[in-house]
Amino acid sequence: MSQTGSAGLFQPVTGRIRGVLRGRIAAGFYIHRMNRLPKRLLGRRELVDFPAFALGGVEAKVDTGAYTSAIHCTNIHLETNAPARPVLVVDLLDPGHEGADGRPLTFPDFVLRDIRSSNGEVQERYVIRAVVQLYGEHFEAEFSLSDRSDMKYPVLLGRSLLRQGRFVVDVARRNLSYKAQARAAARRARP
């Protein structure tokens, strides 16, 4: 039987493909087709960094059922200065969170969008673009702003971010990105 089309996806091969050794793939990476870049694994729960907000190690839930990512905010309101456009002002995370200094953040660029919650209810939420760090790389994604104080995790990572970063979720694991960054930092620190 010949191997044509998608039947030969996992053939053993040798050589280099886009910087990744075929047959010998670094931990946390998965090649699902030979002609594409490897996909990276994320656990069901991850620790993420927001460099623009000077926040690191924020607990996030990876949710393949949500399209848009979300971040916990309180005191969400608009401030209008006479000649300028309105500015969105929020308190990001709770004051008890490490790194949250209690100062309000302002966002001049935002949109108001209908977001369907997990229970099927449609809510109008403000959406911003923010940079999140996973596996030492920065990804810009849309985050809806909502009060997630009744949720266990202040950040939710949705499908649009997962697709952009070519991530696959392994629900049996956690903090894969954070552990990979720690290993890379330890390797750099060695003489």
Annotated model-derived regions:
Residues P12:
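Cationic, low-complexity basic patches in intrinsically disordered or flexible, solvent-exposed regions
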Residues R22-R33:
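Short, Lys/Arg-enriched N-terminal segments with co-localized hydrophobic residues
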Residues I31-P191:
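Pepsin/retropepsin-fold aspartyl endopeptidases
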